[in-house]
Amino acid sequence: MAPSLKKIIILSDIHLTSDGKKIADLDPLNKLEAAINHLLEKHKDLDHLVFTGDLANNGLESEYAHLKKVTSGLSNPITFMMGNHDNRDSFRKEFPYYAFDENGFIQSSINFGDYILLFLDSLKDPYSNVEKNKGFLCKKRLDWLENQLSLVE
């Protein structure tokens, strides 16, 4: 039997800013709202939406508040991932219900039956200069990955 197909859409590097600040003369919030409207209109059969980092441009709570507002009306499952511009603590304040692993990392797995998606948190602690923060996988995160892979048949 052929594997069942799933429609998964990934939005990456949305770089939300505070108060309509622009990046390269573009407003990331307007662009995200347009993308969400497009998804709602053209991809009603969406099974899962994934946002890979950078969710925010400066890791500010206000930037995650925009993300929360824009995504709050979506009925599809959503997975968020951190990037080097993100701040886990600021994200947590706006999304306190979001799943964190036992070590406080924002990583998860989704089992679609025929395949599994693994989402790793590579944000380097502590949050610092974003230009120098290229990501990191510590032993705890690698152990989590190894455990997830061991669960796969």
What are these regions (language model features)?
Residues 61-152:
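Extended active-site neighborhood of metal-dependent phosphoesterases/phosphodiesterases
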Residues 1-65:
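N-terminal active-site segment of His-dependent metallophosphoesterases
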